[in-house]
Regions:
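Membrane-interface junctions at the ends of membrane-embedded or membrane-associated helices
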Residues: 15-44, 214
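Catalytic lumenal/periplasmic loop and adjoining terminal transmembrane helix
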Residues: 40-209, 213
Protein backbone atom coordinates (compact mmCIF):
# COMPACT_ATOMS: atom_id res chain seq x y z
CA UNK A 1 0.00 0.00 0.00
CA UNK A 2 2.76 2.47 0.90
CA UNK A 3 4.33 2.01 -2.54
CA UNK A 4 1.14 3.27 -4.19
CA UNK A 5 0.84 6.50 -2.21
CA UNK A 6 2.04 8.73 -5.12
CA UNK A 7 -0.86 7.66 -7.34
CA UNK A 8 -3.66 7.90 -4.75
CA UNK A 9 -4.52 11.50 -5.81
CA UNK A 10 -5.07 10.24 -9.36
CA UNK A 11 -7.37 7.52 -8.04
CA UNK A 12 -9.40 10.23 -6.30
CA UNK A 13 -9.70 12.29 -9.48
CA UNK A 14 -10.75 9.30 -11.58
CA UNK A 15 -13.24 8.17 -8.93
CA UNK A 16 -14.84 11.63 -8.93
CA UNK A 17 -15.00 11.67 -12.72
CA UNK A 18 -16.50 8.17 -12.80
CA UNK A 19 -19.23 9.06 -10.30
CA UNK A 20 -19.95 12.28 -12.17
CA UNK A 21 -20.45 10.34 -15.40
CA UNK A 22 -22.80 7.88 -13.68
CA UNK A 23 -24.90 10.71 -12.26
CA UNK A 24 -25.10 12.50 -15.61
CA UNK A 25 -26.00 9.32 -17.47
CA UNK A 26 -28.58 7.82 -15.14
CA UNK A 27 -30.23 10.81 -13.45
CA UNK A 28 -32.48 13.00 -15.63
CA UNK A 29 -31.21 16.55 -16.11
CA UNK A 30 -34.44 18.05 -14.80
CA UNK A 31 -33.63 16.54 -11.39
CA UNK A 32 -30.03 17.72 -11.46
CA UNK A 33 -31.22 21.29 -12.04
CA UNK A 34 -33.17 21.07 -8.80
CA UNK A 35 -30.91 22.55 -6.10
CA UNK A 36 -32.39 20.49 -3.26
CA UNK A 37 -32.05 17.17 -5.10
CA UNK A 38 -28.49 17.96 -6.17
CA UNK A 39 -27.55 18.92 -2.63
CA UNK A 40 -29.06 15.69 -1.26
CA UNK A 41 -27.15 13.63 -3.82
CA UNK A 42 -23.87 15.30 -2.88
CA UNK A 43 -24.49 14.79 0.84
CA UNK A 44 -25.42 11.16 0.27
CA UNK A 45 -22.29 10.62 -1.79
CA UNK A 46 -20.06 12.25 0.83
CA UNK A 47 -21.71 10.14 3.53
CA UNK A 48 -20.98 6.83 1.81
CA UNK A 49 -17.46 7.87 0.83
CA UNK A 50 -16.74 8.85 4.45
CA UNK A 51 -17.85 5.58 6.06
CA UNK A 52 -14.58 3.69 5.69
CA UNK A 53 -12.21 6.60 6.51
CA UNK A 54 -14.19 7.33 9.67
CA UNK A 55 -14.23 3.63 10.52
CA UNK A 56 -10.47 3.42 10.06
CA UNK A 57 -9.86 6.52 12.18
CA UNK A 58 -11.68 4.82 15.06
CA UNK A 59 -8.59 2.60 15.49
CA UNK A 60 -6.62 5.58 16.77
CA UNK A 61 -9.11 6.49 19.48
CA UNK A 62 -7.42 3.86 21.65
CA UNK A 63 -3.77 3.15 22.53
CA UNK A 64 -1.83 1.01 20.07
CA UNK A 65 -2.32 -2.71 20.67
CA UNK A 66 1.39 -3.11 21.48
CA UNK A 67 1.06 -0.54 24.25
CA UNK A 68 -2.13 -2.16 25.56
CA UNK A 69 -0.46 -5.57 25.58
CA UNK A 70 2.67 -4.22 27.27
CA UNK A 71 0.61 -2.56 30.01
CA UNK A 72 -1.30 -5.79 30.60
CA UNK A 73 1.84 -7.96 30.64
CA UNK A 74 3.59 -5.77 33.19
CA UNK A 75 0.52 -5.78 35.44
CA UNK A 76 -0.56 -9.41 35.12
CA UNK A 77 2.43 -11.61 34.27
CA UNK A 78 4.74 -12.23 37.25
CA UNK A 79 8.21 -10.76 36.99
CA UNK A 80 10.82 -13.41 36.24
CA UNK A 81 8.50 -15.33 33.89
CA UNK A 82 9.93 -16.75 30.67
CA UNK A 83 8.24 -15.24 27.62
CA UNK A 84 8.63 -16.93 24.24
CA UNK A 85 8.29 -14.63 21.22
CA UNK A 86 8.56 -15.32 17.51
CA UNK A 87 11.61 -14.15 15.61
CA UNK A 88 11.10 -11.72 12.71
CA UNK A 89 8.54 -9.89 14.84
CA UNK A 90 8.40 -7.27 17.59
CA UNK A 91 9.29 -8.29 21.12
CA UNK A 92 6.77 -7.66 23.85
CA UNK A 93 6.46 -5.97 26.24
CA UNK A 94 7.86 -2.84 24.61
CA UNK A 95 8.89 -1.61 28.06
CA UNK A 96 9.77 -3.49 31.23
CA UNK A 97 11.41 -6.37 29.36
CA UNK A 98 14.22 -6.35 31.91
CA UNK A 99 11.74 -7.91 34.35
CA UNK A 100 11.37 -11.04 32.21
CA UNK A 101 13.44 -13.66 30.44
CA UNK A 102 12.89 -13.55 26.70
CA UNK A 103 13.08 -16.73 24.62
CA UNK A 104 12.90 -16.90 20.83
CA UNK A 105 10.94 -19.33 18.64
CA UNK A 106 12.59 -19.54 15.18
CA UNK A 107 9.39 -20.53 13.40
CA UNK A 108 10.37 -19.01 10.05
CA UNK A 109 13.37 -21.31 9.76
CA UNK A 110 12.96 -24.32 7.44
CA UNK A 111 11.04 -27.25 8.95
CA UNK A 112 14.05 -29.34 9.92
CA UNK A 113 14.58 -31.79 12.75
CA UNK A 114 17.07 -29.39 14.34
CA UNK A 115 14.54 -26.55 14.29
CA UNK A 116 11.94 -28.56 16.14
CA UNK A 117 14.39 -29.94 18.67
CA UNK A 118 15.29 -26.33 19.43
CA UNK A 119 11.65 -25.19 19.66
CA UNK A 120 10.60 -28.16 21.80
CA UNK A 121 13.40 -27.53 24.27
CA UNK A 122 12.41 -23.85 24.41
CA UNK A 123 8.73 -24.66 25.00
CA UNK A 124 9.61 -26.94 27.91
CA UNK A 125 10.92 -23.96 29.88
CA UNK A 126 8.45 -21.38 28.55
CA UNK A 127 5.80 -19.88 30.82
CA UNK A 128 4.02 -17.72 28.23
CA UNK A 129 3.94 -17.57 24.44
CA UNK A 130 3.36 -14.14 22.92
CA UNK A 131 2.31 -13.76 19.29
CA UNK A 132 2.92 -10.09 18.47
CA UNK A 133 1.15 -10.09 15.08
CA UNK A 134 0.01 -12.30 12.24
CA UNK A 135 3.33 -11.92 10.43
CA UNK A 136 4.22 -15.60 10.78
CA UNK A 137 1.17 -17.65 11.70
CA UNK A 138 -1.05 -16.34 8.89
CA UNK A 139 1.23 -17.07 5.90
CA UNK A 140 3.06 -20.12 7.27
CA UNK A 141 -0.15 -22.08 7.78
CA UNK A 142 -0.79 -21.77 4.05
CA UNK A 143 2.64 -23.01 2.93
CA UNK A 144 2.06 -26.75 3.29
CA UNK A 145 1.96 -28.01 -0.31
CA UNK A 146 5.47 -29.41 -0.41
CA UNK A 147 5.01 -30.81 -3.92
CA UNK A 148 4.81 -27.30 -5.34
CA UNK A 149 7.06 -25.40 -2.95
CA UNK A 150 10.83 -25.33 -2.37
CA UNK A 151 11.79 -27.67 0.47
CA UNK A 152 13.06 -24.79 2.62
CA UNK A 153 9.81 -22.86 2.19
CA UNK A 154 7.30 -25.57 3.03
CA UNK A 155 5.99 -25.59 6.61
CA UNK A 156 3.72 -28.57 7.36
CA UNK A 157 5.14 -29.01 10.87
CA UNK A 158 4.88 -25.30 11.61
CA UNK A 159 1.26 -25.29 10.42
CA UNK A 160 0.58 -28.24 12.72
CA UNK A 161 2.25 -26.38 15.60
CA UNK A 162 -0.08 -23.41 15.14
CA UNK A 163 -3.16 -25.62 14.91
CA UNK A 164 -2.20 -27.32 18.17
CA UNK A 165 -1.39 -24.00 19.83
CA UNK A 166 -4.70 -22.37 18.91
CA UNK A 167 -6.70 -25.47 19.83
CA UNK A 168 -5.04 -25.82 23.23
CA UNK A 169 -3.41 -29.17 22.40
CA UNK A 170 0.10 -27.80 22.80
CA UNK A 171 -0.26 -27.38 26.56
CA UNK A 172 -0.86 -23.62 26.41
CA UNK A 173 -4.18 -21.80 26.69
CA UNK A 174 -5.07 -18.38 25.31
CA UNK A 175 -5.53 -15.96 28.18
CA UNK A 176 -5.59 -12.58 26.45
CA UNK A 177 -6.06 -11.02 23.03
CA UNK A 178 -5.58 -7.44 21.89
CA UNK A 179 -6.92 -6.23 18.57
CA UNK A 180 -8.02 -3.03 16.90
CA UNK A 181 -10.16 -3.01 13.79
CA UNK A 182 -12.03 -0.38 11.80
CA UNK A 183 -15.44 0.20 13.38
CA UNK A 184 -18.37 1.78 11.56
CA UNK A 185 -19.41 4.90 13.52
CA UNK A 186 -22.68 4.77 15.49
CA UNK A 187 -23.26 1.12 14.54
CA UNK A 188 -20.31 -0.22 16.55
CA UNK A 189 -19.80 -2.78 13.78
CA UNK A 190 -16.22 -3.97 13.37
CA UNK A 191 -14.63 -4.65 9.98
CA UNK A 192 -12.33 -7.67 10.06
CA UNK A 193 -9.16 -6.58 8.24
CA UNK A 194 -6.92 -9.49 9.24
CA UNK A 195 -6.38 -10.37 5.56
CA UNK A 196 -5.39 -6.81 4.63
CA UNK A 197 -1.90 -5.67 3.69
CA UNK A 198 0.85 -6.20 6.30
CA UNK A 199 1.14 -2.44 6.73
CA UNK A 200 -2.19 -2.64 8.55
CA UNK A 201 -2.17 -6.02 10.28
CA UNK A 202 1.51 -6.22 11.27
CA UNK A 203 2.88 -2.70 11.57
CA UNK A 204 -0.08 -0.41 12.24
CA UNK A 205 -2.49 -2.24 14.57
CA UNK A 206 -1.42 -5.88 15.02
CA UNK A 207 -3.56 -8.49 16.68
CA UNK A 208 -1.65 -9.75 19.74
CA UNK A 209 -2.35 -13.09 21.41
CA UNK A 210 -0.95 -14.30 24.75
CA UNK A 211 -0.88 -17.96 25.79
CA UNK A 212 -0.08 -19.37 29.22
CA UNK A 213 1.29 -22.82 29.97
CA UNK A 214 -1.34 -24.98 31.66
Amino acid sequence: IRYMLPIYPMFTIFAGWFLSEIIIKFIPKRYLKNYLITKCLILLLVFFISIYPMSFLSIYLHPNTRIQASDWINKNIPHGSRLAVEHWDDSLPVYGMQNYTQLTLPLYDPDTKEKWMNIESTLRVTDYIIIASGRLYLPLQKLTDCKNLPANRCYPLTASYYRNLFSGKLGFIKIKEFKAEPTIPLMNFGINDISADENFTVFDHPKIIIFKKE
